Amino acid sequence: MRETDEQPVAGGAASTEGLETSIGYRFTDRRFLDEALTHRSWLNEVRSPTVPDNERLEFFGDAILGFCIGKMLLRHYPESREGALARMKSALVGEETLADLAAAVELGSYLRLGRGEERSGGRHRRSLLANALEALLAAMYLDGGMAPVERLVDAWFGPRLAGVAAGIKGRDFKTDFQELAQAQYGGLPRYVLVDTSGPAHDLRFTVAAYVGERLLGQGTGRSKKEAEQAAARQCLERLETGRCSAAP
C-alpha cells in the first residue's frame, strides 16, 4: 500500500474524553491509549508512524481478561468444577459479547483506521471491535495496574454472570445437540472447519455444523473446540425455537 503524508482516518471523535468517561478511567500516559486504538491498517498509510499497532496489546489484553474472568468465576462459584468454569468463561468472553461491549462504549468511533479499512466497514466489524476491546484492557493495566481493569470487568461482566451460569453451567452443547439431532434427524452431527482468520498469536476458527448434508449452524472461537461448542449452541437455539425444521 502506498505511503502518504496525508493523515488517514483517526477516529470519529475529536478526542477520547468520551471513551474515558464511558469506561470510568482517565489515562495518565496517553501513549498506551493511542496504541490500543491504532489498527495496523493505519500504520500502512502513515509515513514514519510514532505509535505501534494494537496487536501486541490485544494479545496481552486477552490474557488479562481471562485472568479477571477466571478470578470472578472462582469467587462466585467456588464449588464448580473445571469443565463448568471453562464453559462459563468461554460464554462470557466470546467475540460476540466483546463486540457488544465495545459497541456499547462506541469504541469503533475512536479507532485509528486506514482509509481502506474505513471504507470496508472496519469501524463496525465485530472481530475488530472485540480485538480492540482486549487491547484497551491491556492499555488500562499498563497505565494504572490491575485494580481499574478489574473494576471495569466486574461492571461489564458481573450483570451477565447469573444468566450465563444458569444457561451454561455444566452444559455441554455438543452433547445436547448430538442427542437432539439423533432424535429429530436420525443422524449424528459433524463439524467442518470453514475459516481460520486473525494473526498467528490470536487465531479465530469458524466451524459449520451439519447433520447429513443439512447445514444447521456455525460458530467462531479461539480454538476448534470452542468453535464447535459455539456452533452446537447456535444449532440448539435454532432447533429449540423452531427456526430449523424438525425433519430432513
Swiss-Prot record:
Reported cofactor(s): Mg(2+)
Gene Ontology MF term list: double-stranded RNA binding; metal ion binding; ribonuclease III activity; rRNA binding
Residue ranges of every copy of the DRBM domain listed in the record: 172-241
EC number: 3.1.26.3
Main location: cytoplasm
HAMAP family for the chain: RNase_III
Pfam family membership, one: dsrm
Domain RNase III: from-to ranges: 16-145
GO biological process, one term: RNA processing
Originating species: Geobacter sulfurreducens (strain ATCC 51573 / DSM 12127 / PCA)
Residues binding Mg(2+): 58, 131, 134
A GO cellular component entry from the record: cytosol
Catalytic residue list: 62, 134
Protein name, UniProt field: Ribonuclease 3
Covalent S-S links between cysteines: none
Subcellular location(s) per record: Cytoplasm
